[in-house]
Regions:
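Non-catalytic structural scaffold of enzyme domains
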Residues: 1-8, 24-25, 29-311
Length: 311
């Protein structure tokens, strides 16, 4: 695929625009401050966008009293088309900001690309903060396949990283691994999926599905967390022909082995009532001109508090 750089015209300078930008930064800081849990954050989640949300939501199902923050590093989206040094730099920069701001008890990397490239460096640089990574569920796929043909739907960087090849060699040596990098599908999930019609969603996933059907894969690993959002669409179209697997259960279980938040004690005034689950806050990175509306809508649908742009 050829990558073409497109120069964007410089916006006309307007004095009022600077005042609006400054006001927006102040408002974002107010939002950020108001959404920081009063108690210590149990888990911080990081992805380049919305891919890690299914992991956060699944953790909240199992541990509703967990204090969580989620940061979508939209400033650096997508990670999957970058080279390894740039991914490490971006992930470490984001993690440093999150740790300084929220001081999480544990960190969940809700991104396969970050995990196979930068997890070791994150653990080294920010020790003793524990990091839980997300890697392609090749081991599980190998245990489920009937014909020995496993598909891997992921980003280019995840597919090309030696760590992924090591997983395949260790757990699926007797299987054929059929890989497909699909940056267009990642972009669709991030920027179009949540407002798309059913027909548009099916059209978007069809090329990937047809690819794996053509190669007779009976089990496909969703090796990019963004693809968990489209799993129901893939399952509907594939029927019994393909089983789709991911690492969500294993990642969440590991996170909860490290930190197991307990339900808060009921106050004396409401001792008979059950404490309410802790809300989770969602932040993005980027510039003041980024379109925040889709993320606000997604938070409303997911029961998350929108915190705005993380400074």
């Amino acid at each position: 695929m050829n990558l073409v750089a497109i120069d964007k015209p410089t916006a006309e300078h307007k004095p009022g625009a600077e005042r609006k930008s400054a006001a927006k930064k102040i408002q974002n800081k107010k939002n950020e401050n108001s959404l920081v849990p009063k108690n210590r954050v149990d888990f911080a989640f990081l992805d380049s966008g919305t891919g890690g949300l299914p992991y956060l939501l699944h953790l909240k199902e199992k541990s509703p009293y967990s204090n969580c923050v989620y940061v979508a590093d939209t400033k650096n989206f997508p990670y999957g088309e970058k080279d390894t040094p740039r991914i490490i730099e971006a992930a470490c920069s984001a993690a440093e900001s999150i740790i300084k701001r929220f001081k999480p008890a544990a960190f969940v990397i809700g991104c396969n690309t970050i995990s196979v490239t930068a997890l070791e460096e994150l653990r080294r640089r920010f020790f003793p903060v524990p990091f839980v990574g997300t890697v392609p569920a090749i081991k599980r796929a190998a245990s489920l396949t009937k014909n020995g043909k496993i598909g891997l739907l992921a980003t280019r960087r995840t597919i090309e990283e030696p760590y992924t090849a090591e997983l395949a060699e260790r757990y699926a040596a007797n299987c054929t691994l059929i890989s497909r990098a699909d940056p267009d599908l990642v972009d669709f999930v991030e920027h179009g999926f949540f407002t798309a019609s059913d027909a548009e969603k099916e059209e978007a996933v069809r090329p990937a599905l047809d690819f794996f059907l053509k190669h007779d894969a009976d089990t496909v690993v969703l090796g990019c967390t963004h693809f968990l959002h489209i799993a129901p669409v893939l399952e509907k179209l594939a029927g019994a022909r393909i089983r789709f697997v991911d690492s969500k259960e294993g990642v969440v279980n590991q996170a909860l082995r490290i930190v197991r938040p307990a339900a808060p004690s009921a106050s004396s005034e409401s001792a008979a009532s059950e404490p309410a689950p802790s809300p989770s806050a969602f932040f993005i990175t980027g510039h003041a001109g980024i379109d925040e509306a889709p993320y606000k809508t997604l938070c409303e649908r997911s029961g998350l508090l929108y915190g705005g742009i993380l400074a």
